[in-house]
């Protein structure tokens, strides 16, 4: 593994990471602050009267707690889509960009071989996702317990975020693998992103 390449990649992707953190902050804060336990009770009654409609939007059980609310309105779609787009762009910057611009040859001319370079890019990929998911967890914990003063089932919330991290590593690995296999940018990004979106649908 190349520590120099690791530091360079982490620095070069800071701006993109901050943009996605800002997006998650915007959606996460706004949606968390929308929580109202009384509305939750009303939504439960509405879900009982129209179960098919709520099931179509992935809300079979709207719930009445803060965690149920977050699962339905954040974890059901937004916190899957935004980090997945991050995975697509990160796969491009870590692998596909070098292949597309022909600069992979310069990396291979260093003392590090293909295996070491690939290992470094994988470590960067996992670290970037870990930072994003850790930030998301801390943000939602802060918004719900400090700003809204609502109690969360901490361990259930933690397991939920660990599961989300694992899901994004899986979806992101499809994009990363696709970027490694194909030389042309339309295939390297298109195949991984396309398969990932099929999983989401």
List PLM regions with ranges.
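Short coil/turn motifs that cap or connect alpha-helices
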Residues: 113-114
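Long, hydrophobic alpha-helical segments
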Residues: 71-96
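Transmembrane helix boundary and interhelical loop/hinge segments in multi-pass membrane proteins
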Residues: 88-108, 122
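Interfacial loop/helix-cap signal at membrane boundaries in integral membrane proteins
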Residues: 48-74
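Interfacial/capping segments of alpha-helical transmembrane domains
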Residues: 32-54
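Aromatic- and glycine-rich beta-strand/loop motifs that create alpha-glucan
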Residues: 1-24
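Secretory targeting signals
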Residues: 29-32, 119-171, 175-180
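Transmembrane helix segments
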Residues: 29-37, 185-201
